[in-house]
Amino acid sequence: MAKVIGIDLGTTNSCLAISENGQTKVIENAEGARTTPSIIAYLDGGEILVGAPAKRQAVTNAKNTIYAAKRLIGHKFEDKEVQRDIESMPFEIIKADNGDAWVKAQGKELSPPQISAEVLRKMKEAAEAYLGEKVTEAVITVPAYFNDSQRQATKDAGRIAGLDVKRIINEPTAAALAFGMDKGDNKDRKIAVYDLGGGTFDISIIEIANLDGDKQFEVLATNGDTFLGGEDFDQRLIDYIIDEFKKEQGIDLKQDVMALQRLKEAAEKAKIELSSGQQTEINLPYITMDATGPKHLAMKITRAKFESLVEDLIARSIEPCRTALKDAGLSTGDIDDVILVGGQSRMPKVQEAVKDFFGKEPRKDVNPDEAVAVGAAIQGEVLSGGRSDVLLLDVTPLSLGIETMGGVMTKLIQKNTTIPTKASQVFSTAEDNQSAVTIHVLQGERERASANKSLGQFNLGDIAPAPRGMPQIEVTFDIDANGILHVSAKDKGTGKAANITIQGSSGLSEEEIERMVKDAEANAEEDKKLTELVASRNQAEALIHSVKKSLADYGDKLDAAEKEKIEAALKEAEEAVKGDDKTAIDAKAEALGTASQKLGEMVYAQAQAEAQAGEGAQANASAKKDDDVVDADFEEVKDDKK
């Protein structure tokens, strides 16, 4: 059975795990780290760096280094959250032809799924290196509060990376899975998973029940904010530093992309240090310059100051907790355990706020960086048939419905409904002899249709002429286990039907995905070719160095014609390694090897002669040593003076 890997595709960091025979393992990446920064850099020559290598060069290549692409996934360019991010990101966010928020790097227009696919591909390669076999299937996690188009876009990213996404599961649910399966007891418990990651916040109330030795994880309610996370905490600190520097020096660092990138790194580091210390210092020499010369940034930040900067962000995470508990029909006293997930949940003030709200200490025995990937891997093993002791009952985070007369939203599926699920409702025409209807699919909680998220629309035509209100049009909503919606409409009079798998009112078309898959495959092929070229070049250069050294040592012992032949081959090989033609490099290296055969024989003969001479000298020395040995008897003399 093919192995199904679990991937936590995070805003700031991503993590990979595999579960086999009930044992879960977090897989290290090529650099040996258990998490990978979700950072992608596009270089001049078409090369793409992912993770730590991309992060290391971010300051010098700020405009082409993309981070937090997950915050753009499934979003329109005009969305207010995207507009807010445009001001603070050093790279360029653009409006795609379909109205989506895309990114421009090295002159190329890139969709967020395409960028995220680079991270997924790195995860895939790490899994293949660890398992020693090809990996094509994965479970990928998303924030519980992701809407339909964001889920679809994440699935598209998997496809572009060459992965068959077997299931999209919610991050808090995955963390609950990791926590619940780790607990050996069979106690039923209700848990709250507070997940404050790099870019998104989720709260899920989950009931873990023991059913004859199997564990059932039922999500009772979920809530959240897809634009609240560690990146926002960093940004508050960055904005504060920029304002203070402007007051002191009169220079606005917002206009300098290189300075912004350095500030981002420094703010992230300072934030982490303030989780354990009371004060930290930000020191950035030569941050910028003006007519008077270079300017240096040195600033002390206390934990209290940082907490005051982000106080409202922490408060923003508590309101969804209140809503989720209410939706689940529970009070804080009903919660047995509070689990913290996501790197930002390490902040002491966040932990204090969670403790104050739930009235109990959050558990510290769950790794906030790895729990989500571990849960995804467990679900992967379930889907591959490797285990059957787990049942997952997740929910849809937002209500789903259609726009009806008067611009209102009529809900067919309420939020927090267990998925997969199906619902149907009969509607009719608004005018006499109406021959077609437009089904406008919406997601959200507002009564006014325009205030909700538009997921897409489709038409049902050829309706038989009839007075208004007479035709019967049955609309069916079907949500699969990934939380992705399929909608169909049927005229009960004529039997005519139309349907749509929601791709969002924007999203990537099938043709675009296919093109991106091909691009990604071509990139992988290019990477392979580059690796082979570098290997050939290294071999050729090692041979050139060796021949040059031998020629310097033994060239005078060769006849002129032989020496000339080697020097000509040497020159051709040196020219070849300057180019990018692997075949030419291999051919010239082989020609050099053949031409220098005689020289090699001389080197070998000389080395052999020296070895023999060395052995002879050693034998003589040994014999001489024996000649100097004197046989003698020793008499013990006692010292009476002791």
Swiss-Prot record:
Compositionally biased spans, kind Low complexity: 609-622
Function summary: Acts as a chaperone.
Induction: By stress conditions e.g. heat shock.
Keywords in alphabetical order: ATP-binding, Chaperone, Nucleotide-binding, Phosphoprotein, Stress response
Biased composition, class Acidic residues, residue ranges: 628-642
Protein name: Chaperone protein DnaK
GO terms, molecular function: ATP binding; ATP-dependent protein folding chaperone; unfolded protein binding
Annotated spans, Disordered: 609-642
Disulfide bond positions: none
Domain of life: Bacteria
Positions carrying Phosphothreonine: 200
Keyword Phosphoprotein included in the entry's annotation: yes
Database matches in InterPro entries: ATPase_NBD, Chaperone_DnaK, Heat_shock_70_CS, HSP70_C_sf, HSP70_peptide-bd_sf, Hsp_70_fam
Matches recorded under HAMAP family: DnaK
Database matches in Pfam families: HSP70 (PF00012)
Family, as annotated: Belongs to the heat shock protein 70 family.
Residue ranges of coiled coil: none
Keyword Chaperone attached: yes
